[in-house]
Swiss-Prot record:
Keywords: Calcium, Calcium channel, Calcium transport, Calmodulin-binding, cAMP, cAMP-binding, Cell membrane, Cell projection, cGMP, cGMP-binding, Coiled coil, Ion channel, Ion transport, Ligand-gated ion channel, Membrane, Nucleotide-binding, Olfaction, Sensory transduction, Transmembrane, Transmembrane helix, Transport. The gene is CNGA2. InterPro entries: CLZ_dom, CNG_cation_channel, cNMP-bd_CS, cNMP-bd_dom, cNMP-bd_dom_sf, Ion_trans_dom, RmlC-like_jellyroll. Belongs to the cyclic nucleotide-gated cation channel (TC 1.A.1.5) family. CNGA2 subfamily. The record marks F364, V368 as: Central gate. Pore-forming subunit of the olfactory cyclic nucleotide-gated channel. Operates in the cilia of olfactory sensory neurons where chemical stimulation of the odorant is converted to an electrical signal. Mediates odorant-induced cAMP-dependent Ca(2+) influx triggering neuron depolarization. The rise of intracellular Ca(2+) levels potentiates the olfactory response by activating Ca(2+)-dependent Cl(-) channels, but it also serves as a negative feedback signal to desensitize the channel for rapid adaptation to odorants. Residues 1-20 have a biased composition (Polar residues). This is Cyclic nucleotide-gated channel alpha-2. The lineage of its organism: Eukaryota, Metazoa, Chordata, Craniata, Vertebrata. The keyword Ligase does not apply. GO terms for cellular component: intracellular cyclic nucleotide activated cation channel complex; non-motile cilium membrane. It comes from Oryctolagus cuniculus (Rabbit). It is a multi-pass membrane protein.
Amino acid sequence: MTEKSNGVKSSPANNHNNHVPATIKANGKDESRTRSRPQSAADDDTSSELQRLAEMDAPQQRRGGFRRIVRLVGVIRQWANRNFREEEARPDSFLERFRGPELQTVTTQQGDGKGDKDGDGKGTKKKFELFVLDPAGDWYYRWLFVIAMPVLYNWCLLVARACFSDLQRGYFLVWLVLDYFSDVVYIADLFIRLRTGFLEQGLLVKDPKKLRDNYIHTLQFKLDVASIIPTDLIYFAVGIHNPELRFNRLLHFARMFEFFDRTETRTSYPNIFRISNLVLYILVIIHWNACIYYAISKSIGFGVDTWVYPNITDPEYGYLAREYIYCLYWSTLTLTTIGETPPPVKDEEYLFVIFDFLIGVLIFATIVGNVGSMISNMNATRAEFQAKIDAVKHYMQFRKVSKEMEAKVIKWFDYLWTNKKTVDEREVLKNLPAKLRAEIAINVHLSTLKKVRIFQDCEAGLLVELVLKLRPQVFSPGDYICRKGDIGKEMYIIKEGKLAVVADDGVTQYALLSAGSCFGEISILNIKGSKMGNRRTANIRSLGYSDLFCLSKDDLMEAVTEYPDAKKVLEERGREILMKEGLLDENEVAASMEVDVQEKLKQLETNMETLYTRFGRLLAEYTGAQQKLKQRITVLEVKMKQNTEDDYLSDGMNSPEPAAAEQP
């Protein structure tokens, strides 16, 4: 009947749909089971439920449509809440590997509403912990630049505005905007300081409580808080044109000095930055002194004597630019003590000039000392290099070296200085730890070393050892790097320049070697059976100035001592190269192997004889020691026996005689 009423043939899908009404009738029971079902069962995917609802016939869907919609909404809501909780509770495995155990939060528990709130709080705290600035990072340095700007603004313009009333009144709206913008930056800096990490046991601390305690208990925190006290509120009592009420903003100076220190460390031109920094300090002092001079002149009275600022009623001296430039000129002459200024008249003027002279002497001494030291540091490398040249010149003159050779040596030194190749890498890097030296050497030389055929597919540890042993060498035009028949003790890698393989006449060129090429690597391995042996097979000459890296045979053997497997790999690699080039005599290799076996047997026999001799000597020493020990034991036994007999006799003589019989 079902098939006829539907007008279609029965199918598995239709048969399945026939059972749907029964399922719908049991919705109430299903809902109760769903509420009592464990959490693990409730976590099943709802896709099957959606599919089951979609497969229902239209009439059946209309009969229980509202109930199914309600149930579907409930299931979707439950599924969304579950995924939301899982998203918050899921730990970041990548970050957890780098965060300390004290920062790892416990996974949120799924349960009632209170547990959800706790989980949300912990998740928020966990995310908040990630926003910790590393004081050695780039973002912290950029923030130092941001905070240094308002600090420098306050240090320069607050004093000027307090002294020059025209400057304060003429641009009041500009100062109002800049003042409160700097206040916002100050407040932001206070919070950033609370989120700035520090190192403890070599690890960056990210615990908010530790960060807060580390900052709050410092003097800098007190100064930072004092610098953001809203003293501007006093404007309502005394008027808005009193910028001296904001002098507490000057207490935030430490951040500017910290920015200067970090910039000096980061910059590639530290000497130039030190000079610029020193000039900035001097200009700020001169600026402050000019402002104070104008303020003193205002308090005494403009134009009352020759020392103070002229009367501002005079049009020549009555505008702001002339006021500041005149005071700045007077301050510069006074502090540098290089010009004549009007003499003081009143006592307070004398005291101020005396104070200025003392400050000027300190400034002059600081300039001379710092600039002289900086110039000496800047010229230290040049002076050391020039001393080497002078020593070589003196030696060549003493030994009466030819002018041509002397000119060649001077040109070689000139090439080194012009191309900045005078630095001794080992001397410069000797103060670094071995690991850092290795990393620098790897970054500089590893790609070059990998170009050598015998070092391809070599063990990484051995390559690191070899990289540390590469020595740069510079050859002049026409210099022979090696000659045919010379014993090969080094291998060379060309960094820059052109080398030519020439005939014995030194003119005919057979081949040209450029940057990245290498030669001499086979000869330093001393591979047995090589037709070349350890001798050079060609003349190699530098066409111009050439920069090469040199690796000596002794350094290679010292490095492979700790890597015996790598040594075998290198020798095998060298044999393969020689075989490809037809330079390996297999008969000689076999003969050398037989010779090696015989030598090993002879060495073994020698070692056995040596061991036998040593064993015989030790046995003789052991026998002699046993005899001496037995003799000493015998002597001790005799002495013990004699002592026992003597003690027995002495005891018998000292015992009392038997008492005589009593008389009747």
